[in-house]
Amino acid sequence: MNPKIIVLNPEKCTKCYDCINICKEIHGESRVRKVDGIPIFCMQCENAPCKEICPVDAIYLKDGIPIVDKERCIACGMCAIACPIGAIFIKNRVAHKCTLCLDVDRITPACVEACKDKALLLVSEETLDMMKEEKRKKILKILREEAKENL
Protein backbone atom coordinates (compact mmCIF):
# COMPACT_ATOMS: atom_id res chain seq x y z
CA MET A 1 0.00 0.00 0.00
CA ASN A 2 1.21 3.51 -0.76
CA PRO A 3 2.20 5.75 2.14
CA LYS A 4 -0.70 8.03 2.91
CA ILE A 5 -0.58 9.06 6.55
CA ILE A 6 1.58 11.79 8.05
CA VAL A 7 2.77 10.81 11.51
CA LEU A 8 4.22 13.31 13.98
CA ASN A 9 6.79 12.24 16.56
CA PRO A 10 6.10 14.74 19.36
CA GLU A 11 9.43 13.91 21.00
CA LYS A 12 11.26 15.24 17.93
CA CYS A 13 8.95 18.18 17.17
CA THR A 14 10.44 21.51 18.30
CA LYS A 15 7.30 23.47 17.37
CA CYS A 16 9.20 25.48 14.75
CA TYR A 17 6.05 25.30 12.58
CA ASP A 18 8.00 24.94 9.33
CA CYS A 19 5.33 22.39 8.36
CA ILE A 20 2.57 24.96 8.84
CA ASN A 21 4.50 27.74 7.11
CA ILE A 22 5.39 25.72 3.98
CA CYS A 23 1.79 24.50 3.71
CA LYS A 24 0.52 28.08 3.82
CA GLU A 25 3.14 29.14 1.28
CA ILE A 26 2.14 26.41 -1.19
CA HIS A 27 -1.63 26.35 -0.67
CA GLY A 28 -2.34 29.93 0.42
CA GLU A 29 -3.85 28.58 3.64
CA SER A 30 -2.16 26.11 5.97
CA ARG A 31 -4.05 22.85 6.00
CA VAL A 32 -2.06 21.73 9.02
CA ARG A 33 -4.11 22.40 12.13
CA LYS A 34 -2.48 23.38 15.41
CA VAL A 35 -3.96 22.14 18.69
CA ASP A 36 -2.26 23.21 21.93
CA GLY A 37 0.78 24.11 19.83
CA ILE A 38 1.03 20.65 18.26
CA PRO A 39 0.57 20.25 14.48
CA ILE A 40 -2.39 17.99 13.61
CA PHE A 41 -2.58 16.21 10.25
CA CYS A 42 -5.51 14.61 8.43
CA MET A 43 -5.41 10.83 8.85
CA GLN A 44 -6.82 10.29 5.32
CA CYS A 45 -9.43 7.91 6.74
CA GLU A 46 -10.32 4.92 4.60
CA ASN A 47 -14.04 5.46 5.20
CA ALA A 48 -13.67 9.20 5.69
CA PRO A 49 -16.46 10.63 7.86
CA CYS A 50 -15.99 14.01 6.15
CA LYS A 51 -16.72 12.44 2.75
CA GLU A 52 -19.59 10.30 3.99
CA ILE A 53 -21.46 13.18 5.64
CA CYS A 54 -21.08 15.79 2.87
CA PRO A 55 -24.62 16.57 1.64
CA VAL A 56 -23.44 17.72 -1.81
CA ASP A 57 -20.71 15.11 -2.44
CA ALA A 58 -18.04 17.82 -2.50
CA ILE A 59 -15.46 15.41 -1.08
CA TYR A 60 -14.21 12.68 -3.39
CA LEU A 61 -11.33 10.21 -3.33
CA LYS A 62 -8.19 10.61 -5.43
CA ASP A 63 -5.76 7.73 -4.98
CA GLY A 64 -7.58 6.93 -1.73
CA ILE A 65 -7.14 10.48 -0.37
CA PRO A 66 -10.24 12.57 0.42
CA ILE A 67 -10.14 15.78 -1.66
CA VAL A 68 -12.49 18.77 -1.39
CA ASP A 69 -14.05 19.97 -4.65
CA LYS A 70 -14.06 23.69 -3.88
CA GLU A 71 -16.62 24.38 -6.61
CA ARG A 72 -19.18 22.00 -5.06
CA CYS A 73 -18.51 22.81 -1.40
CA ILE A 74 -21.29 24.85 0.23
CA ALA A 75 -19.34 25.44 3.47
CA CYS A 76 -22.05 23.84 5.61
CA GLY A 77 -19.40 22.60 8.06
CA MET A 78 -20.76 19.06 8.36
CA CYS A 79 -17.38 17.66 7.32
CA ALA A 80 -15.62 19.62 10.07
CA ILE A 81 -18.10 18.34 12.65
CA ALA A 82 -17.66 14.75 11.45
CA CYS A 83 -13.85 14.77 11.48
CA PRO A 84 -12.72 12.83 14.57
CA ILE A 85 -9.48 14.82 14.97
CA GLY A 86 -10.46 18.27 13.75
CA ALA A 87 -8.27 18.19 10.65
CA ILE A 88 -10.83 19.69 8.26
CA PHE A 89 -12.05 23.26 8.66
CA ILE A 90 -14.10 25.93 6.92
CA LYS A 91 -12.47 29.20 5.88
CA ASN A 92 -13.48 31.69 3.21
CA ARG A 93 -16.67 29.72 2.59
CA VAL A 94 -14.96 26.47 1.63
CA ALA A 95 -13.66 23.35 3.42
CA HIS A 96 -9.90 22.86 3.69
CA LYS A 97 -7.94 19.70 4.55
CA CYS A 98 -4.58 18.12 3.90
CA THR A 99 -4.32 16.38 0.54
CA LEU A 100 -0.74 15.16 1.01
CA CYS A 101 0.01 17.79 -1.66
CA LEU A 102 -1.67 15.67 -4.37
CA ASP A 103 -3.37 18.80 -5.66
CA VAL A 104 0.03 20.38 -6.40
CA ASP A 105 1.54 17.21 -7.89
CA ARG A 106 4.18 16.58 -5.24
CA ILE A 107 5.49 13.09 -4.57
CA THR A 108 6.24 13.84 -0.91
CA PRO A 109 4.14 16.32 1.07
CA ALA A 110 5.91 19.65 1.47
CA CYS A 111 5.54 19.59 5.26
CA VAL A 112 7.41 16.27 5.52
CA GLU A 113 10.25 17.64 3.38
CA ALA A 114 10.35 20.93 5.32
CA CYS A 115 10.65 19.31 8.75
CA LYS A 116 14.30 19.80 9.64
CA ASP A 117 13.83 17.86 12.89
CA LYS A 118 12.59 14.77 11.00
CA ALA A 119 9.56 14.72 13.28
CA LEU A 120 7.21 13.99 10.37
CA LEU A 121 7.02 10.69 8.52
CA LEU A 122 4.83 9.66 5.61
CA VAL A 123 3.77 6.07 6.26
CA SER A 124 1.32 3.42 5.12
CA GLU A 125 -1.50 2.17 7.31
CA GLU A 126 0.42 -1.07 7.81
CA THR A 127 3.51 0.80 9.01
CA LEU A 128 1.38 2.93 11.32
CA ASP A 129 -0.16 -0.23 12.80
CA MET A 130 3.34 -1.64 13.41
CA MET A 131 4.44 1.64 15.03
CA LYS A 132 1.40 1.55 17.33
CA GLU A 133 2.11 -2.06 18.30
CA GLU A 134 5.77 -1.27 19.09
CA LYS A 135 4.68 1.68 21.23
CA ARG A 136 2.07 -0.47 22.99
CA LYS A 137 4.69 -3.14 23.81
CA LYS A 138 7.11 -0.49 25.09
CA ILE A 139 4.46 1.02 27.38
CA LEU A 140 3.38 -2.42 28.59
CA LYS A 141 6.99 -3.29 29.47
CA ILE A 142 7.36 -0.07 31.47
CA LEU A 143 4.09 -0.70 33.31
CA ARG A 144 5.12 -4.28 34.16
CA GLU A 145 8.47 -3.08 35.51
CA GLU A 146 6.75 -0.43 37.62
CA ALA A 147 4.26 -2.99 38.92
CA LYS A 148 7.13 -5.30 40.00
CA GLU A 149 8.82 -2.43 41.83
CA ASN A 150 5.61 -1.64 43.71
CA LEU A 151 5.03 -5.20 44.98
Curated annotation (Swiss-Prot):
**Cofactor note text:** Binds 4 [4Fe-4S] clusters.
Q: Which residues cross the membrane?
A: none
Q: Which cysteines are joined by disulfide bonds?
A: none
GO MF term set: 4 iron, 4 sulfur cluster binding; electron transfer activity; metal ion binding; oxidoreductase activity
Which intervals hold domain 4Fe-4S ferredoxin-type? 4-32, 33-63, 64-93
Query: Which taxonomic lineage does the organism of this UniProt entry have?
Result: Archaea, Methanobacteriati, Methanobacteriota, Methanomada group, Methanococci
Residues bound to [4Fe-4S] cluster 2: 23, 98, 101, 111
Q: One matching Pfam family, short form?
A: Fer4_11
For binding [4Fe-4S] cluster 3, which residues are annotated in this chain's numbering? Answer: 42, 45, 50, 83
Q: Which organism is it from?
A: Methanocaldococcus jannaschii (strain ATCC 43067 / DSM 2661 / JAL-1 / JCM 10045 / NBRC 100440)
Q: So where does [4Fe-4S] cluster 4 get bound?
A: 54, 73, 76, 79
Give the protein's recorded name.
Uncharacterized ferredoxin MJ0155
What residues bind [4Fe-4S] cluster 1, as annotated? 13, 16, 19, 115
Q: Which InterPro entries match?
A: 4Fe4S_Fe-S-bd, 4Fe4S_Fe_S_CS, 7Fe_ferredoxin, RnfB_subfamily
Keyword presence, Electron transport: yes
Q: Which domain of life is it from?
A: Archaea
Q: Output the SUPFAM superfamilies linked to this UniProt entry.
A: 4Fe-4S ferredoxins
